[in-house]
Curated annotation (Swiss-Prot):
Comment field on protein domains: The N-terminal domain interacts with the head of the 30S subunit; the C-terminal domain interacts with the body and contacts protein S4. The interaction surface between S4 and S5 is involved in control of translational fidelity.
UniProt KW keywords: Ribonucleoprotein, Ribosomal protein, RNA-binding, rRNA-binding
Full protein name: Small ribosomal subunit protein uS5
Organism expressing this protein natively: Rhodopseudomonas palustris (strain ATCC BAA-98 / CGA009)
UniProt lineage: Bacteria, Pseudomonadati, Pseudomonadota, Alphaproteobacteria, Hyphomicrobiales
Family designation: Belongs to the universal ribosomal protein uS5 family.
One cellular component term from this protein's GO annotations in UniProt: small ribosomal subunit
Reported function: With S4 and S12 plays an important role in translational accuracy.
Pfam hit, one: Ribosomal_S5
GO biological process: translation
Recorded GO MF terms: rRNA binding; structural constituent of ribosome
Amino acid sequence: MAAERERGGRERSREREERDSEFVDKLVHINRVAKVVKGGKRFGFAALVVVGDQKGRVGFGHGKAREVPEAIRKATESAKRNLTRVALREGRTLHHDIAGRHGAGRVYLRAAPAGTGIIAGGPMRAVFETLGIADVVAKSVGSSNPYNMVRATFDALKHLDSPRSVAARRNIKVSTLQARRVGGDAEVVAE
């Protein structure tokens, strides 16, 4: 009985390690924060981490602790709890250009042809690398605060639509939608 319980615990931890190993995490920002107490200042650290599986799932988290490794661990756990799925075109770029905002920060994301790479600054680059996007052009305007930039990027990604979802919303075929996108003047077969 005890051996079964022990083995079960080991198997659960092994499953958890396998699940966690599929994720890539990037530390975006670490900040030293201070709490003023009666005896002076008590210092701690706040960490912002982005986690993704490089296949279309990504999340970000924030963690605070007295030590840096503990803050990073808390932020990573928070990010894994807040994963969102993003539809990618050909598994490498966005389906369409989009803008997102949070606070005074705005970001503009543009789909890019193959071979372009990730042209984005700081916090946005971490989001795209963990998401699995290989080709994108991004510009941030306004606030350069890492928290605002990450949240604005997630706001933009949240409003991203795949052709399948657009076609379902409009009650048309995906092929009709794709023909309009590629050709512009291409003949569209009436349904």
